[in-house]
Amino acid sequence: MDAQLRKETVTMEQVTAHGASQAVVEGEITLPGGLREETHVLHAGGMAVVDSAESGADRATLSGKVIFHVLYTQGAPNQVHVVEATADFIHQCDLPGAQPKGRVQAQARVEHVDASVQGGRLNMRAIVQLDVRGASTQALEVLTGVNAPGGAEVATQEIALRRTVASGQADTLLREEFELPEGLQVRETLCADAAAQISNITGGQGRIGVEGTVTISAVHASDLPGKPLVVTHHEAPFSQTLELSGESGDLLDARVTVRDVAVASQDAGDGGKTLRAEVLLGVQGTADTQEKLTVLRDAYTYQGAALTFSGRDVVIRTGQRRASAAESGKTTLLLPDGTPPVRGMLAAFATPIMTAQDSTGSRLNTEGMLEITLLYMTDENTAPVTVHQETPFRTSFAVSAAPDSIITLTADEVEAVPITSDRVELRYVLRLTCDGVETQSAHLLTDAQEETADEVDDGLYLCYCQTGEDWWTLAKEYRVPQETLRRLNPDLPDALKAGTGVVVWKKSP
């Protein structure tokens, strides 16, 4: 080959796949007490945790567990008990484009839980939504320039490369104690949910520091007359430092997930109660580098053999876009016909199930259904009453989401206030976390071959542009410098229209 090709080996991180799937996870446990005791399930909830994710050819294998907690009464109708159980799962998710031994980011959330009692055994079932993103880091030799004996015209493009060069992860156990109001008359703490938010990331010299807040909603059995159940809300800060293994990177990022929650109440010694909470957090940290590279987009020679290029289409990760936001909401619920009237509200639980989302400028619009469980007391019975309802929601968040982002929507600070005996106002806060990557699609030239070209005779030509032609395609067709072509047609605009006449002067050296 007479032409000389300039090449450079580029290490790039490519987003290979994105997928979503649902898994049904079931578990069972034997309840304490006698088989003849009447048992009623009041509420069933749970959380899902992904322990490992492995990438295969066009698929990913996820392993994890669902931690169930079920509130129920047994025997005495006004005594609320809890049972917790864990069910493991292994789920294969279709992930077109995924490659063996590639990196997989997976996230799980429980969208629905139901439980039933049969023969002294509690059967539990959870519907788990799984979101998966695949990525791989590859080295690719790309063309950055070309030199030819008779001269050559080159067109370049700039690509931005962001890749993870160091990572680390660790589990940290957050222990906190909270004083419970004496007026609640807490007998025992039954269960709790927790959520974690990152507020600050610092680091350097192979370390990353992650700080944030954990919010805890605890459910307690109470000795208050007519109120066997109470709910309290708490906050606690957390801080974790991770050692990063790998190269040095100046762009730091972190994720935190709640992996388990354990709560108990104990006497404080002065007649009050203290809530002891242990929250197991999984913290992941990464360090990225970002660089810009100018590569060859196209080229042609002025004379002699023509160049034919081969290349590869890639989707390159150029940045990270993660954001969180919260919006409060409320709705009025009309209890179904035949439902016992509301005397006093005990607790309310809500799970948002997002069915659609779209971005409008810097806002993300979501809609879906709220799956609601109301626990309350009625005048006609000393046992708590459970009502399950669904209501639609539409909420707009001040978040700019990247395409194919992994979006998590949760509800907390859920509170139900009776309006009348058959109407309840539900107040809640929806918290959204958007985890996405910014990408750039590019066709990268990797090699070139020479082939015989039809020579253009010297002379002065008047050509008329066809649809889709521009200055580059005309100059390439006649094998003349683009600068010479523009100089001969100084009055023509940068964007040529179909039918525009262009003067071309072809003169061999």
Where do the protein language model's features map onto the residues?
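Primarily a LysM-type cell-wall glycan-binding module
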Residues: 450-487, 492-509
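Membrane-lipid interaction segments
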Residues: 2-457
